[in-house]
Structure formats: structure tokens, C-alpha cells
Amino acid sequence: MRQTAQDYINELEKCDLGLEYQCVNALQKTPWRINEFVVDTLRLCWDSGQEWEGLPPRDNLSLPKYPFSKEPKYLNEEETLKFKIFKSERNKIHSYNNKSMSKRIQIERTIQLAEQYKDIEKLWYVWQLDFRGRKYPVESFLSPQNADYSKALLEFANPATITNDEEAKWLAIHGANVFGVDKVSLEDREMWAYMNVENAVGVYNDPLTNRWWQEADKPWQALAWCYEWALYNNARQFG
């Protein structure tokens, strides 16, 4: 039987949604802040005009030129076939350019928001839930549920300090996961992270020159991880 929106609302009024409200409120009470290392690096990368994994191209692809000197209605059978291929390729590039334009607007807006708020100590999000109970932040650009670079721009405003090897293990495992090393045991992931301390420190020192983080499945979250992993291991080594 098909239900109307009002039927659904009437049904919800009979339910105990206390736990759902608690979940939403817990999310809304969680403070965030901007990761300055990531936003500064992202701005430099985006403005460089170079190709970076996880970012759209800065410029549109060139559309192919009409390959014949006569109008389509005068083409022979072989030329007509080539013309159809030309139109198909042109349409694909045109569609790709339109999508890229939308992505460029999104990333520029996201960077601008991050730069606007990077000096603010704590940020909070307004959250909503849908009919399935899934929770989403209302903000559509700079969001912990958005693109890889958007997630990397955010960190908890009340971070937990790593105090022992067991806690460090989970930071190591996170690093392996964002690099795509997630089909091996947790122990192997931890080992992988320690084997790549030097790479992480190199990224920490100069992320534009040392592009190891660009090899990751989630490159911008990998960049954020390199920063944290380098800080942790530098502190462990030098105190």
C-alpha cells in the first residue's frame, strides 16, 4: 500500500525517536577545526595549474574541430561514419567539460570556506537525518561527508593525544587504509606505516615536491595522515 508523506509523519509520531535525537545531538556537539597544513597545501596545488590526484582539471579539454571542408549532408558513406564518430567524441568531451566546471566551482568554494574559517578554534555542523535514519551535515561544500579533499580539510577540534604504542597503531592502520593497503592484516598495515616513516616526513617537509602521497587511493586524506604520522614519529625520536 502506498503511503503519503503525511501517513509517514503520523506513523513517526507514535515512535520513540529519543535515541535518534541523541545521535544527532551528539554529532552536533562535536567540534571541528580546519587542518591548516592541508588547506595551505591544497590552495598551492590548485593555484599551480598542475595535475593533482583527486582534483579536477583547471582547464577544459579542447573540442575536436570539424574534420571536413563540406557540410554533413554532402558527405559520402565513409565520411558520414567518421562524422558520427567525431560527433560522439565531441559530445563526450563537452559533457566532461561541463562536469569539470561543476567540480571546479565546488573545490574553489570549499577552499574559500576553509580559508575563511581556518583561524577559528572550533566549528560545529548542523546535522539532519533522512527517513532511513542516516545522518548528514547540512553544509554541502566543506563537510566531513564530502569529497576526499573536503574530509582532509577537517579535523577534530579536541584531538586525542597518542600516549602509547597501542594508540599509535590505529593511526598507522588509518594511514595504510587511505593508501589502499587495506587487504592485509592489521599487523601488516601497522608495519607498512612504520616502513614509510621517511616518506611521510618527506611529505611533511615539502608536499609539493615529495608527491608520494599522490599515490594513495585517497590522496588528500593521505596528505593529512603524513602530517600527523611525521609529527608523531618526530616526537617519538627527538622527544
Regions found by a protein language model. Give the residues of each.
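Non-catalytic nucleic-acid-binding interfaces of large nucleic-acid enzymes and RNP effectors
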Residues: 1-239
